[in-house]
From Swiss-Prot:
It comes from Enterobacter sp. (strain 638). GO terms for cellular component: plasma membrane; proton-transporting ATP synthase complex. Its main location: membrane. HAMAP family: ATP_synth_alpha_bact. F-type ATPases have 2 components, CF(1) - the catalytic core - and CF(0) - the membrane proton channel. CF(1) has five subunits: alpha(3), beta(3), gamma(1), delta(1), epsilon(1). CF(0) has three main subunits: a(1), b(2) and c(9-12). The alpha and beta chains form an alternating ring which encloses part of the gamma chain. CF(1) is attached to CF(0) by a central stalk formed by the gamma and epsilon chains, while a peripheral stalk is formed by the delta and b chains. InterPro entries: ATP_synth_asu-like_sf (IPR023366), ATP_synth_asu_C (IPR000793), ATP_synth_asu_C_sf (IPR038376), ATP_synth_F1_a_nt-bd_dom (IPR033732), ATP_synth_F1_asu (IPR005294), ATPase_a/bsu_AS (IPR020003), ATPase_F1/V1/A1_a/bsu_N (IPR004100), ATPase_F1/V1/A1_a/bsu_N_sf (IPR036121). Produces ATP from ADP in the presence of a proton gradient across the membrane. The alpha chain is a regulatory subunit. Disulfide bonds: none annotated. This is ATP synthase subunit alpha.
Length: 513
C-alpha cells in the first residue's frame, strides 16, 4: 500500500489538529540551606508571605522571609532528611486548619490533625490561621458574664464575654489550674472552649485532658497541642490555629472561651524562628514585631454584633451576637511584671489576674493579689447579685493588707482596728477555694452575703472553711428551689435578700459547723 504526498500531508494536519498540550505552570525552587528547621530556597519568584511551600515527603513549610533572591521558610514537621538541592513548589495557599463542631472533644496538633487515637476529625471546613480581627463598627460592648466559678475572680475581677483577661504569675502559682477550672465551669453554660497548650510536656497535657474528661468538660472543649518536643514553628503557630477554631463559633452567633497556655513560650519559639531567619534582634533578643505577634492574636478575641453574624452566615443566623473570650497566660521570672513580654501583653489585654508566689506558699489559693489584679471592662458584665454583694470585699481586703503591714510594728491596737483585721482575715479565708471545685452564682452570692452582713463575726477563723461547706450543704438540702432561681436569673432584690437573711439566721441557729 502506497501513500501519496497529499494523503500524508492530510494525515499530519489531522494529527496536529487533534494534538492537545496541557501545560501546568509550577513555581519551583531549590533548597540552598537547611538549619534547625529553617530552610532557604532559591527560585520561588512569586511566593506570598505566609504561603505554604510543598516539600518532598508530603510536608510543608511556611514562607516567612521574602528576600531579593531567596525565600526563608520554616518547616512544619521533621526536617532531618531535607538536603541542599531538593526541589520545592509553591502551593498558592495560605495555611488553613480544620474548623467545626466535630473538633469538640478532640485533641489535635497545630495543623488540626488528630493525635488522640479516636480516628479522623469530622470538620465543617477550613479556615486560615491568620485572619484580620473584626473592626470597631462590627463589635458590641461586653455586657454578659463568663463565670469562672472562683469567688475571688467573679467577685473582684469579673470577666465578660468577648474580654481578654491575662492570667500572670511565676511558675507553680496555679495559672493553668485557674484556666482549667474556668473551662470546667463552662460545661453547662453553652460556652464552647479551646485550650491551646504551647511548649509543655506531653505528660502535663495528658493530665489536663484526663482532668477535663473526668469533670465532663472535654466534650465541650477542643485541645490544641504543640509540645516542647515539636518544632519552634509549630509552637509559634499553635495559638493562631486555636483562635481560628474558636472564631468558628464566634462568627456563627455563639460564645467561645480560649485559653493560651502560655504566650511566654510562644514568644520564645518566635524569637528562635526569627533569629534563625537572621532577623535583627531587639530587647531581650526578641524581634521588633513581638508586640504585633500578640496584639494581632488577642485582638481577634471580641464580641461581635448581630449584623456581623448575619452577614457572615448570609442570613442563616439572625439577632444573635457572638463572642470569643481569651484567657492568655504569661509566666513571669521572680515576679517581674515589668519584663518585655509581660508588659506587652498587659497593655494589650483588658485586665490581669496576678497570682503571687508568697500568697500561694502561705496557703491562700487561688493566690490572687487583689491589689494589682484588675478587670477593665468586666464590671459591666457582672451578675447583679454578685455585683451588689461584692462591693465591700475588695475594700475589706485592701484595708486588711494595709493594716496587717502596720500592725506588725504597733504593740496595742484599738478595737476598731482589731475588728477590721479580724474581718479581713476571715474574708481572705472565705475566698480560698479547692481546685476542680467551681461554685455556682447562687453559692457565691450566699457566701458573699454572709461575709457582707457580718455573719462571720462570731465564727472562729479556723472554722470558716467548715462553716462555708456546712452552709452550702444546708441550702442544697433545704432550699434548692431558691438556689435554682438565683442561678437562672442572677437577680437580686428585697425578696431574695430577705430569703438569704432567713436562711443564714436559721443556719446560724443550728450551730452545725
Amino acid at each position: 500500500m502506497q501513500l501519496n504526498s497529499t494523503e500524508i500531508s492530510e494525515l499530519i494536519k489531522q494529527r496536529i489538529a487533534q494534538f492537545s498540550v496541557v501545560s501546568e505552570a509550577h513555581n519551583e525552587g531549590t533548597i540552598v540551606s537547611v538549619s534547625d528547621g529553617v530552610i532557604r530556597i532559591h527560585g520561588l519568584a512569586d511566593c506570598m508571605q505566609g504561603e505554604m511551600i510543598s516539600l518532598p515527603g508530603n510536608r510543608y513549610a511556611i514562607a516567612l522571609n521574602l528576600e531579593r533572591d531567596s525565600v526563608g521558610a520554616v518547616v512544619m514537621g521533621p526536617y532531618a532528611d531535607l538536603a541542599e538541592g531538593m526541589k520545592v513548589k509553591c502551593t498558592g495557599r495560605i495555611l488553613e486548619v480544620p474548623v467545626g463542631r466535630g473538633l469538640l472533644g478532640r485533641v489535635v496538633n497545630t495543623l488540626g490533625a488528630p493525635i488522640d487515637g479516636k480516628g479522623p476529625v469530622d470538620n465543617d471546613g477550613f479556615s486560615p490561621i491568620e485572619v484580620i480581627a473584626p473592626g470597631v463598627i462590627e463589635r458590641q460592648s461586653v455586657d454578659q458574664p463568663v463565670q469562672t466559678g472562683y469567688k475571688s475572680v467573679d467577685a473582684m475581677i469579673p470577666i465578660g464575654r468577648g474580654q481578654r483577661e491575662l492570667i500572670i504569675g511565676d511558675r507553680q502559682t496555679g495559672k493553668t489550674a485557674m484556666a482549667i477550672d474556668a473551662i470546667i465551669n463552662q460545661r453547662d453554660s453553652g460556652i464552647k472552649c479551646v485550650y491551646v497548650a504551647i511548649g509543655q510536656k506531653a505528660s502535663t497535657i495528658s493530665n489536663v485532658v484526663r482532668k477535663l474528661e473526668e469533670h465532663g468538660a472535654l466534650s465541650n472543649t477542643i485541645v490544641v497541642v504543640a509540645t516542647a518536643s515539636e518544632s519552634a514553628a509549630l509552637q509559634y503557630l499553635a495559638p493562631y490555629a486555636g483562635c481560628a477554631m474558636g472564631e468558628y463559633f464566634r462568627d456563627r452567633g455563639e460564645d467561645a472561651l480560649i485559653v493560651y497556655d502560655d504566650l511566654s513560650k510562644q514568644a520564645v519559639a518566635y524569637r528562635q524562628v526569627s533569629l534563625l531567619l537572621r532577623r535583627p534582634p531587639g530587647r531581650e533578643a526578641f524581634p521588633g514585631d513581638v508586640f504585633y505577634l500578640h496584639s494581632r492574636l488577642l485582638e481577634r478575641a471580641s464580641r461581635v454584633n448581630a449584623e456581623y453574624v448575619e452577614n457572615f452566615t448570609k442570613g442563616e443566623v439572625k439577632g444573635k451576637t457572638g463572642s470569643l473570650t481569651a484567657l492568655p497566660i504569661i509566666e513571669t521570672q521572680a515576679g517581674d511584671v515589668s519584663a518585655f513580654v509581660p508588659t506587652n501583653v498587659i497593655s494589650i489585654t483588658d485586665g490581669q489576674i496576678f497570682l503571687e508566689t508568697n500568697l500561694f506558699n502561705s496557703g491562700i489559693r487561688p493566690a490572687v493579689n487583689p491589689g494589682i489584679s484588675v478587670s477593665r471592662v468586666g464590671g459591666a458584665a457582672q451578675t447583679k447579685i454578685i455585683k451588689k454583694l461584692s462591693g465591700g470585699i475588695r475594700t475589706a481586703l485592701a484595708q486588711y493588707r494595709e493594716l496587717a503591714a502596720f500592725s506588725q510594728f504597733a504593740s496595742d491596737l484599738d478595737e476598731a482596728t482589731r475588728k477590721q483585721l479580724s474581718h479581713g482575715q476571715k474574708v481572705t479565708e472565705l475566698l480560698k477555694q479547692k481546685q476542680y471545685a467551681p461554685m455556682s452564682v447562687a453559692q457565691q452570692g450566699l457566701v458573699l452575703f454572709a461575709a457582707e452582713r457580718g455573719y462571720l463575726e462570731d465564727v472562729e477563723l479556723a472554722k470558716i472553711g467548715s462553716f462555708e461547706a456546712a452552709l452550702l450543704a444546708y441550702v442544697d438540702r433545704d432550699h434548692a428551689p431558691l438556689m435554682q432561681e438565683i442561678n437562672q436569673s442572677g437577680g437580686y432584690n428585697d425578696e431574695i435578700e430577705g430569703k438569704l437573711k432567713s436562711i443564714l439566721d436559721s443556719f446560724k441557729a443550728t450551730q452545725s459547723w
